[in-house]
Amino acid sequence: MITIVVIPTAHFSWTDTNFLNSVDYRLTSQPKIRDRFAVYAPGWLRRQLDEFSASLTASELLQALQTIPIPVKARCLLLPKPKRFAQWLLDVPSANIWHIPVTTLRATVASKHPSSDVYNYIPDHVPPSAEFDTVTRRVAAGRDIYVRSTKVLGAPLCLAAPAKYYAGYLSTHQLDGVYPDNWAPDNFHKREFCLTILPSLLGPRTFLLDVDADRDASYPLSVLWPQLRVLALKSRLLLPPVALLRRVVDPGLKPTWSADSDAAFRALRLSRPSSASKPTGFDFSALPVVDIICLFESEPDDHGRVAPGTRLTIHSVPTDLLTSLSIQEGVRYPLRQESGMFVPWVLLALLMSDDVTISGTRRSVKLETAHASARPFVHITVERCASARVVDVRGSPAMYANAVCLTLPKGSYKSTIIDTLPAMFSDLSILEQAAVIDSDALGDSLRPSFETQFLERLENLDPKLLDRAVASILSPASDTSDDAVTTVLDVFNALYREVMTPAQRSRLPLLTQQGRVLAFAHSDYELLSANIPIQVVRGSIPIDHVVNLLARRNRVGGTALQVLLDYCYRTQASPLAPTPAGRLYKQLFGPWLMVPRLSDPLIKLRLVASAPAKVLRAAGWTIDGDPPLEVSCLCAYVTDRAMAAALIERRLDSRALVNVGGDQLMFVEYAPPLPLVSIPRTFLLPVTYVVHWVSPQRVLLNGGNVSFTSGLEWTFDDDPQVVTSTGV
């Protein structure tokens, strides 16, 4: 059976028994078609949704309904009040399936103020104080659930005893919404298709009918249609109505087969059109990667002896990175610059990788990129490439199009990757520096800077205590309970809460709403403590960042202060396992590495919102002309104009809330958030992007702050650009 979730559209009648007609009139054209469908839209569900929608948010309600099976076989049996409950079991001994002692029942009946202790004999009953989703979690088992409240969600509510035992407990009106004790759900006859209004997408072969129409305002979950559609889109559970009609009504219909509905087409046993196998644009989400086995070698010692080289495997390096930089197998390359640091191409390979291991083992290692060891590596040879494969970089680790924050410790070469990779595309700005937020930018913006204030407070402590704290942190067997380390942490945390958290909170729009933002931070606590609503990726790199810190002697407070700062930030971080930062770097920069091998020029698109001229004029702005002003919220590039023209006709469920200041500083929010998986895979996205007017020359005079909401649509840019690679 294929289950199809239908969110009622406008003019839907709950009393209309012809449910199929409300989906599409062609489904009722022949009796034999109707026989292939079963409908699951119980009346008790409507009552429960109406009741809970007044006390819960739509998101909470939707989350609770996800675990409910179709059909619901369980019942919620409402127990009478303690005295009437005991009286019922005394009157009908066969109902005492819990074997409650008769003495307990008689004592409860005789008591003027009976307690609820008599219910303790009923295992797993749901008390009135239980969470609202307790019932929904138990419904899947299919067994009856005993409850003591009329407010239940997820199963029909029935009386556990005859109605006379509820006198004085339930009013006549309340009894109308409760089934009698002898009621049982109607037998549900499975058919080829089951249409349901229960928005649960977790069952096998369950899909969401993607009807492009306004929702029924009386249905409590209609406001969640965009969110539910995004959920189905991410899970590839969308079912186009034309596909269903082709399966049951007219085989001659030609639905468009797309990745968004691939699982639904397979469940319907529809054959893929022959034209669907033809390439339609370059897929920028499929990134080729490879593991490279490298030999790292040291210089000869004073006696001319050469130590054996060390073979390391750098995992999941973009193939196009090596191709663009003309890195060849079997060639011996210098590993270090005159400064002692690794050469840029090796740093890029390490930063964009998933891990570095000793070849032939699973032992991960961290490389020292600065001159730290007595005999550092000075040469590298790429011996061979192995395990060539393709990874999907569209939907993770960053999930949304607006902003993501990567947390890395100090000394993690964040500026290296931001400065070096864009240099490969000097003909086009693949990122906008204004939308790259450095981890030290906030502290440096304070007067005096955060590091300077921290140094001033440490200077009030005993110098020997600071030396002991640094030694304890750098010691292989570091003792973090040392009183010196604890003292430094207390000073840091107090100062951070005092000056950094309020400052972080004040720049919320800059982090999350100025377009497509890549922010860096030292720890996720920096964002969480300021309640910044941004996705945070806890990153790690295969480089020993502490050794890199020790090589930076020109920073505030010298290396000692940098080591203390790094340790304090790391103690703030949550204990969640980190994700290789290379996965995010591959997601953001990897698609651009494939550009040099394109044979077609890239055509630029814009994701635009419209600002009505009259709204701006009402806020004091002087605008040239009456047409709406377009706001460019995001851009993208494609290789096939005809393919793009078909894709951009798709309606976007997200809407834009745009705020424009009198200084023309613009911020945009998406409601619901715009997931990356909803953007076609043939769209090449910039690493970062800043919201701006498409035609700023139409703004003759700025006015006051103004906000407006708008739909979103993709449009072709008037000045398409050709992207070429110049190399590093």
From Swiss-Prot:
Keywords: Capsid protein, Host cytoplasm, Host cytoskeleton, Outer capsid protein, Virion. Its main location: virion. GO terms for molecular function: structural molecule activity. GO terms for cellular component: host cell cytoplasm; host cytoskeleton; viral outer capsid. The keyword Transcription does not apply. InterPro entries: Reovirus_Mu2. It comes from the Viruses. Belongs to the reoviridae microtubule-associated protein family. Minor inner capsid component. Displays NTPase and RNA 5'-triphosphatase (RTPase) activities. May function as a cofactor of polymerase. Associates with microtubules and plays a role in the formation, structural organization and morphology of viral inclusions, where the assembly of cores and the replication of viral RNA occur. This is Microtubule-associated protein VP5. It comes from Aquareovirus C (isolate Golden shiner/USA/GSRV/1977). The gene is S5.
